[in-house]
Amino acid sequence: MASGKSLPAFSPERFAPTPQRPLRAKSRVLEHLADIQPHRHDWAQLVFSISGAVRVNTTASTYIVPPSRAVWIPPGIVHAVTAIEQCDLRTLYFGPALLAGEAWQVGRVLEVSPLLRELVLALPALPDPAPPESAADAERRCGIERLVLIELQRARPLALGVALPQDARLRRLCEAMLQEPGRHAGLDEWAQEAGASPRTLSRLFREQLGTSFAQWRSQLLLAHALTLAARGRPMSLIASELGYASASAFTAMVTRTVGMPPSRFFERA
C-alpha cells in the first residue's frame, strides 16, 4: 500500500474532557491513505468513522474498522490512525469517571447501533475555548451524553482486532501481510522476506500471539472482509479480492473461524 500524507494528532488537548464536559466529540475528514501520527493521551477514546474505513494501530494490535464498528482505546495507549479510504472520522473522548470498569481497560472493537451513530452525530464537536452554552443547549447535550454511555454499555464487542508481535522479524511479516491480504503465500515464502526460518516464525506466532500462522491470517482476512462487506460488495467479489478461487472456499474459512457463515457474520456490516 502506498503511503499517504502524515498528519499530526489535531490538538487533542483542545478537546480534553473536563468535570463540566466529561464527554467530548471531535470531527475530522481524512483523505485516502492519510495517517494520524502515533500519539497518546490521558483519557479514553472511541474512534468511529461515519463513512469510509480506517485502520487503528496500537503497539499490540491493529483494527480494521468500517462505519458500522468503532474502536475503544483505553487511556495512555499509543495509537495511530490510517484512512483506508476517504473517511469522515468522529472521535469521542471520555473523562476518567465514565466507563471506568475493568472491561473498559482493554482495547476492542464495538458494534455501532443506528441509535449510537445518530447520537455521535448530534454531539457538538467544538474545541476549547468553546462558546458559552444556553441552559437548554447544555441540558440537551447532557441528555445525548447519557444516551451515548447507555448505548456503549449495550454495544456488542467483536473479536476483530488483529494482534501484533514485538519481535521485529515477525512484526515485519505481519505488517507485510496487512499490506497484501489477498496474497495467499505460505509461511515458507513469507519467511524468506522476514529474515527468519519458518520454524522460528511458527514458534514466534505461538509465543507472542498465542496463535498459529493460519489462524492469525484468518483473523486478518476477516477484518478486511468486514470492510469490503460494509461497502456493499457481493460475497463473490469479496472472496476474489482476498485471493480465494471461489466464494465457497471463502465461506468455508469464515465459518471455520467464527462458527457462522459470512451471510450472518456480515449481515450488520
Predicted regions and their residues:
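…primarily DNA-binding HTH/wHTH and HhH modules…
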Residues: M1-A2, A252-A269
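Generic protein-terminus/edge-of-domain signal
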Residues: M1-A53
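Short acidic-glycine-tyrosine-enriched beta hairpin
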Residues: A60-P75
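Short hydrophobic/aromatic patch on the recognition helix
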Residues: S68, L201, F205, A249-F250, ...
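Ligand-binding loop in jelly-roll beta-barrel domains
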Residues: G76-L99, V106-G107
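Short, Lys/Arg-enriched, Trp-marked, Pro/Gly-tolerant hinge/linker segments that flank
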Residues: V106, A130-A194, E207-Q219
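Terminal helix-turn-helix DNA-binding modules in bacterial transcription factors
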Residues: D188, E207-T251, E267-A269
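Alpha-helical residues within the helix-turn-helix
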Residues: Q192, R203, E207, S240-E241, ...
